[in-house]
Amino acid sequence: MDIRSHIRTVPDFPKPGILFYDISTLLAHAEAWKATVEKLAEAVAPHKPDLLVGIESRGFLVAAPLSLALGCGFAMVRKKGKLPGQTIRYTYDLEYGTDTVEIQADAIAPGQRVVVLDDLLATGGTMAAAIHLLRSVGADVTAAAFIMELAFLNGRDRLDVPAEVLISYES
């Protein structure tokens, strides 16, 4: 199954000059989505995760079905103020400002093997922040995984774990 053919590109979204890779068309095609989850399962299984963590919001769509396929738990990293109860947060720098990610304080047991997922690897900033946050609560982050990456942005350079990617766009 050619997963790439099920990902729509939208020029000038969310602003002029940006080419947006939209997975809505992939999600809408049951066989293509199933094949995507199966391929991710093959890539992630060797990292032996106890728990998958999805990054808000499309990372949830990737991590949740994959956790069922691999028989492991699922937790969420969200933007500040979106999770109930006690949370642990990490604030990181963006090109023009800062952002904050959070996880529930009891979401991860110390030493749990974790793979972090998102739909797209671009600059790597959000994933690097999520990995930092997860380690601060005791996770053993063994890998990051994505449906696709914009390889020309060199996001892998910001990660200190293996990055599993199904589709790489070179330009």
UniProtKB/Swiss-Prot annotation:
Catalyzed chemical reaction(s): AMP + diphosphate = 5-phospho-alpha-D-ribose 1-diphosphate + adenine
Record's GO cellular component terms: cytoplasm
EC numbers for this chain: 2.4.2.7
Protein localization: Cytoplasm
Matches recorded under InterPro entries: Ade_phspho_trans, PRibTrfase_dom, PRTase-like, UPRTase/APRTase
Pathway: Purine metabolism; AMP biosynthesis via salvage pathway; AMP from adenine: step 1/1
Gene Ontology biological process terms, A to Z: adenine salvage; AMP salvage; purine ribonucleoside salvage
Record keywords, A-Z: Cytoplasm, Glycosyltransferase, Purine salvage, Transferase
GO MF entries: adenine binding; adenine phosphoribosyltransferase activity; AMP binding
A Pfam family it matches: Pribosyltran
PROSITE patterns per the UniProt record, alphabetical: PUR_PYR_PR_TRANSFER
Leading EC class: transferase
Keyword Glycosyltransferase on entry: yes
Chief location of this protein within or outside the cell: cytoplasm
Highest taxon listed in the record's lineage: Bacteria
Family statement: Belongs to the purine/pyrimidine phosphoribosyltransferase family.
Job description of the protein: Catalyzes a salvage reaction resulting in the formation of AMP, that is energically less costly than de novo synthesis.
Subunit and interaction comment: Homodimer.
Protein name: Adenine phosphoribosyltransferase
Biological source species: Rhodospirillum centenum (strain ATCC 51521 / SW)
